[in-house]
Amino acid sequence: MEFKFDLHTHTIASGHAYSTVQEMAKAAADKGLELLGITEHAKGIPGTCDEIYFHNMRIIPRKMYGIDLMFGSEINIIDYDGSLSMDAELIEKTLDIRIAGIHTPCYEIGSVAQNTQAYVKAIENPMIDIISHPDDARIPIDYETIVDAAKENHTLL
């Protein structure tokens, strides 16, 4: 089985990327992808989009240049309990795909046990589809525990 998609990408709306949705869709089509996920950063990351952006995503076409598009967010895990930086209602009503990750502007790095718990709690959240960059060397974690939790909850890493 071959998967031809990229589900963790950012546009200029996230504040640190350099392409528009249309430019990214064209590039994805040129590379032979079948599905592209545009997942802008949630609040807490300097320069990212406001909440209204996520409400407006529903007007963007879900197909460009022959590839399917999904729109979502890379939501910040903000504490050791796996709390998220976006309201559940906004997540449920506006996002096709939901990624959660630890970003140091929004999270105080703790012990291996604390950081692992933060990830596991986010993985156990039924609103989360994917965990972003759990391999960040600045954030010590128990990889085996996280992989087991992801497998049990059908969450991508």
Short names for language-model regions:
Residues 7, 39, 132:
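Single, functionally critical "micro-switch" positions that shape active/binding sites
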Residues 13-48:
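Metal-associated gating/positioning segment near the N- to mid-region
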